[in-house]
Structure formats: structure tokens, C-alpha cells
Curated annotation (Swiss-Prot):
UniProt-recorded name of the protein: Na(+)-translocating NADH-quinone reductase subunit A
The keyword NAD is annotated on this UniProt entry: yes
Organism: Shewanella denitrificans (strain OS217 / ATCC BAA-1090 / DSM 15013)
Family of the protein in this entry: Belongs to the NqrA family.
Reactions this protein catalyses: a ubiquinone + n Na(+)(in) + NADH + H(+) = a ubiquinol + n Na(+)(out) + NAD(+)
Enzyme class (EC, first level): translocase
EC number: 7.2.1.1
Species lineage: Bacteria, Pseudomonadati, Pseudomonadota, Gammaproteobacteria, Alteromonadales
Domain of life assignment: Bacteria
């Protein structure tokens, strides 16, 4: 067991009840282009077309052979594009449950399936896009091989669901998914979970992680078990997608069910809700928010994104929906107040005298962007064997060669989310990291 001692357990109100409830009917789903880094789509459909669940919507010009499929049957309602015709979203009005049929196999024969057949079925169904690489956090090439595959069956994000609760309903499917993932690598499949969690392992190598966030991040797991580099690519996948892979091969259909943890200070009934991938959050959250000016976030409070407009749909890789109050109000002489109702990682506020207290946090950053001040905050929340202050400084200054030397290739935006949260300078380090990774990949 690996114990993580550096990090932060965010003391925020609105933790979800760990019981799964059925969500409302969803009439619109969407595939979001921003979820897939570097995507340049070749569209296979147009507005008004009828599609089946699992039918190809578009392929990627820059990653040939990767297919992105419909998350529901129905009619293509919108194809939204932004500046420079960047794909924002493909919206489907849900009608019926017609599905493309994929190859079906007995559970007992999965271990003997040909590796190329497994790969082809995942690509054709669109479930190949559930896999992501380190470095760069992109969908892997269809002919690539991973040095190892990490299954993240632990979640230490604030207000997250307990993976064991979700997996308990689909233990056989999860075990089958692990068996199939082993066909995609010559290395090991690592099942990362919390100590004592009742999660089937099949033939995967079980690794337990204990401690505070980011103990549940795949970046932490990869760093400790099989570090990624320019010469070694590892893949990772979420536990609910492993269940979907198992169901694809034993049932022959694409299962797009997704359990979300709805939580946050402004969530009316924080709990786990069964819905579907790409669900319209306008529909899913219609009766889930308290009155007032609130922001709905797809993903974690630390590194999720605002769900509004053409982006008001659940993210492909998100398993949480967070609701916060918009922090628009100015506080008179706020800097001079003792701060009994404010949280800080430093002992700047009176609230540090109540270490077990939970806070009704808002979207306010508590100030505008200013100079980066290294006062030890970053070292307190980064458990990786890196020099966080030097790495972050290099990202801000654009010294990408030095950033790579310090370990930037191992990281994803979520790995720096705590650094952003505790930063006195209010910098969003995730965006700087993405600029670095894009530049390194482009320039080789």
C-alpha cells in the first residue's frame, strides 16, 4: 500500500449521499469536442440525420482510425462550432433506443479472444476514446501499444462518488473489462483502489493508495508505479468505462449509462444519480440546485468546467456535477476581517482554529492575478517527486525545456489543480501546462 501524506482534503459542504438514485429522463445528449485534445474531426453526419446509438459521428484527421460514436439514438439537432470552426458540440435529440450491434461473446471466452478483435471492437464502438495516454492525455493511436494500463477505481476528488458503490452493481462486467484491457498491453494492468475496497481484480495487479487528495489521481498512481516519459507511453481509463467495455463484449451493445455524484454547497439533494454519458445538464440539474445565482460545473470543483451554453452537457470523462454559488459580491474591507468563515491552507484566517469545519465555498478567487509568491504552499499539496515551485515558475515563464526536465510530461491539468487552488498569485497552472505539452508535442 502506498500512503500519500502531502495534499489537501478540501473542506467543502455538500458531500453526496453514497446511494444511487435514478435521474430524470434525458432528452438531449452531446459529444463535446473540447474533451478531446487536438481533435480535428471529419464529420460523417449532418444536422437532421437519424442516428443509432454507437453509430459513427466523426473521425479524427490527426489520429486516423479513431471513431467517435453517438451516445444515443435520435436526430442530430445541432453541430456547434466556435472560432476557426473548432468543433464545440454535436447535440442529439434522444428518440428511442436503437443501437448498432457489435460482436458478442460468452464471458468465459473473453480471456482467449484475439487481441486485434478486442481492439477493433473498441474502436468501432467508440469506447477506444475512453482510453487516454500519458504523456499528453490524448486518445491513443489505434495501432499504439501501452507500456501499462492504469484503471482508476479510487476517487479522492472533493464531493466524489465512492467507486466501490458503483462497481458493486456490475462486478462481473468490471472483471470482464479488466480481462479485455490486458489484451491491449504487453505490460501490466494496474487496478488502483482504496485500501480494503471490495472491487474485483480479475488478473490485474492490485495497488492500494491511502491518504488525502491527490491519492486518487491517476497521475499519482503513474508516478509511483510506472512513470511516463517521452519514450514510454502508459494509458489510463476510468472504472465506469471498464464496466462499459465488459458489457460491450458480453451484451453486444454500447452501454452509455453513467453514475454522477451531484454535490456542492448549492446542491439541493447531494447524492449519486444514474443518468447517461453526455447528458444535458439543463435537464439533469433542473430540480437539483438551490435558489440563487449558481454555477453548474461538469467535473470536480478543483478542475471541472462551467457547463453553460453549447457546453451545458456532462463531460466524457467526468463523474461529478458540482454546484457552487457565484461569488460576485464584493466584501467591504474583506482583507481586514478575521475570516472565521473562510478557508485558507495557511493560517491567515481565524477559521484555522476549527480544523474540522466545512465551508460554503463559492466561485470567488479571493482576489485578482498577481505575482507568484513561493511561500511553501505548492510543496504542501504536491506528493510527487518533483520541485513544484521551480516547475510552476518555468511553466509561467515559458521555459518548457526546463519544465520537461522537472517532470512536466508526467502531468495533466488535474495534477496541478491543487497548486492553482492554493496559489497566492491566482494562476491557473493547468492552462500553462497544456501550452507546454502542446508545444513539446508539436515541436518534438
Amino acid at each position: 500500500m502506498i500512503t500519500i501524506k502531502k495534499g489537501l482534503e478540501l473542506p467543502i459542504t455538500g458531500g453526496p449521499e453514497q446511494v444511487i438514485h435514478n435521474g430524470p429522463a434525458i432528452n438531449h445528449v452531446a459529444t463535446l469536442g473540447e474533451e478531446y485534445i487536438g481533435l480535428r474531426p471529419t464529420m460523417k453526419i449532418k444536422v437532421g440525420d437519424k442516428v443509432q446509438k454507437g453509430q459513427v459521428l466523426f473521425e479524427d484527421k490527426k489520429n486516423l482510425g479513431v471513431k467517435y460514436t453517438a451516445l444515443a439514438s435520435g436526430t442530430i439537432l445541432e453541430i456547434n462550432r466556435g472560432a476557426k470552426r473548432v468543433l464545440q458540440s454535436v447535440v442529439i435529440a434522444v428518440e428511442g433506443d436503437d443501437s448498432v450491434a457489435f460482436s458478442k461473446h460468452d464471458a468465459g471466452s473473453l480471456a482467449t479472444l484475439d487481441a486485434q478483435l478486442v481492439r477493433t471492437n473498441l474502436i468501432d464502438s467508440g469506447l477506444w476514446t475512453a482510453l487516454r495516454t500519458r504523456p499528453f492525455s490524448k486518445v491513443p493511436a489505434v495501432d499504439a501499444t501501452a507500456a501499462g494500463i492504469f484503471v482508476t477505481a479510487i476517487d479522492t476528488q472533493p464531493l466524489a462518488a465512492d467507486p466501490a458503490v458503483v462497481i458493486a452493481e456490475h462486478k462481473d462486467d468490471f472483471a470482464n473489462g479488466l480481462t479485455l484491457l490486458a489484451k491491449l498491453t504487453e505490460g501490466k494492468v494496474f487496478l488502483c483502489k482504496a485500501p480494503g475496497a471490495d472491487i474485483p481484480a480479475a488478473n490485474a495487479q492490485v495497488e492500494e493508495f491511502a491518504g488525502i487528495h491527490p491519492a486518487g489521481l491517476v497521475g499519482t498512481h503513474i508516478h509511483n508505479l510506472l512513470p511516463a516519459s517521452a519514450k514510454r507511453s502508459v494509458w489510463h481509463i476510468g472504472y465506469q468505462d471498464v464496466i462499459a467495455i465488459g458489457q460491450l463484449f458480453t451484451q453486444g451493445v454500447l452501454n452509455t449509462e453513467r453514475v454522477f455524484a451531484i454535490g456542492g454547497p448549492k446542491a439541493k439533494k447531494p447524492r449519486l444519480v444514474r443518468s447517461r454519458l453526455g447528458a444535458s445538464l439543463v435537464e439533469l440539474m433542473a430540480d437539483e440546485t438551490q435558489a440563487g445565482d449558481v454555477r453548474v460545473i461538469s467535473g470536480s470543483v478543483l478542475n471541472g468546467r462551467t457547463a453553460a451554453g453549447v457546453h451545458a452537457y456532462a463531460g466524457r470523462y467526468h463523474q461529478q456535477i458540482t454546484v457552487l454559488e457565484e461569488g460576485r459580491e464584493q466584501e467591504f474591507f474583506g482583507w481586514a476581517m478575521p475570516g472565521g468563515d473562510k478557508f485558507s491552507i495557511t493560517r491567515s484566517f481565524l477559521s484555522h482554529l476549527s480544523p474540522s469545519r466545512l465551508f460554503n465555498m463559492t466561485t470567488s478567487t479571493g482576489g485578482s492575478e498577481r505575482a507568484m509568491v513561493p511561500i511553501g504552499n505548492y510543496e504542501r499539496v504536491v506528493p510527487l517527486d518533483v520541485l513544484p515551485t521551480l516547475l510552476l515558475r518555468d511553466l509561467l515563464s515559458g521555459d518548457f525545456d526546463s519544465a520537461v526536465t522537472l517532470g512536466a510530461l508526467e502531468l495533466d491539468e488535474e495534477d496541478l489543480a491543487l497548486c492553482t487552488f492554493v496559489c497566492p498569485g491566482k494562476y491557473d497552472y493547468g492552462s500553462y501546462l497544456r501550452d507546454c505539452l502542446d508545444t513539446i508535442e508539436r515541436e518534438g
